[in-house]
């Protein structure tokens, strides 16, 4: 029970940390883009990946983290996740450039529906429960309602926003699939993704001339801007890890819903700090419907978790009883059966007759008598043991039937029932 509570607390803590880091990163990146006109987004992505790769490699060499060394087999296991992670972060940065922060959040609120659909197709783990399905549909309707209040963004921003949602959903589903297919944890996944993506991002940063023209940016003279830039790099590393960890522990849909919950604070900060979206009645109604869908999802997942824990308790209880079928507490102590001596007298008489008939061969008769006596004692002990075992098994079968309502996966009566001869 304590281990179950600890697992739930860890899952909730990781989800909250993911929401905090993700919301903070969105706000800080929007500050860089809107207030300081910082447009070198590929450089931000490259430095985030390289910082994570160098930090994890240093910690691995110092023996502070248990991560296997990078190799081709390890890279092959997370190749799809690494490609989608790089593409998702690029599309997110470009959509933040072309969309207002609240409108970007509205796009991200469609993530649970897309994640659920891709998860059903890829993971093939069955349809979601009615509560989860209702929560996802309500959340998506709220996002569409809120999006109808702002259609003034850049068309490229809308296109990249839609692509970012699709790629992000596929990225989360692929993380969940990798967690089931491989034995590596989220820290190993982040290490492999960072090491694999860093060379490609370095090439892209030079190809886009971000790494060349970024150093002539006048904002480097502002300490606040430099602090925000460094914070974006560090928080980006933390957010990538919490994304992986939350998906490993919980699920892809839960990770996408964390973004829905944290978006309330993001929308509030976006409207107050940037003033690029007026809080229209349609937009506010969409946010309210979105929040209602998030609450329904939390309640549905709580009920599912409690139902699953009850089922696991019943399973463990049944397995515990199945492991010790002969360890039931008997209401009284069974007495041992008395030794049967009916077969010993004829055998001893037979041995005496042999000794009279073979008077001249006393030594041979004595040896034969000893062997017959040993054989009779072994047969006697074997029959005694079989009798005690059959009586005890019969009593235990009757006692299990009398005990009442606990049913086992095996039917011991059917196992020991004698089949009729043909």
UniProtKB/Swiss-Prot annotation:
It is a multi-pass membrane protein. Its main location: membrane. The chain crosses the membrane at residues 9-29, 38-58, 64-84, 103-123, 131-151, 155-175, 187-207, 224-244, 257-277, 280-300. GO terms for biological process: energy homeostasis; platelet dense granule organization; positive regulation of autophagy; positive regulation of protein exit from endoplasmic reticulum; protein exit from endoplasmic reticulum; UDP-glucose transmembrane transport. It catalyses: UDP-alpha-D-glucose(in) = UDP-alpha-D-glucose(out). Coiled coil: none annotated. The keyword Endoplasmic reticulum applies. Could interact with ATG14, BECN1 and PIK3C3 that form the PI3KC3-C1/AIC/autophagy initiation complex; enhancing the formation of the AIC and promoting autophagy. This is Solute carrier family 35 member D3. It comes from Mus musculus.
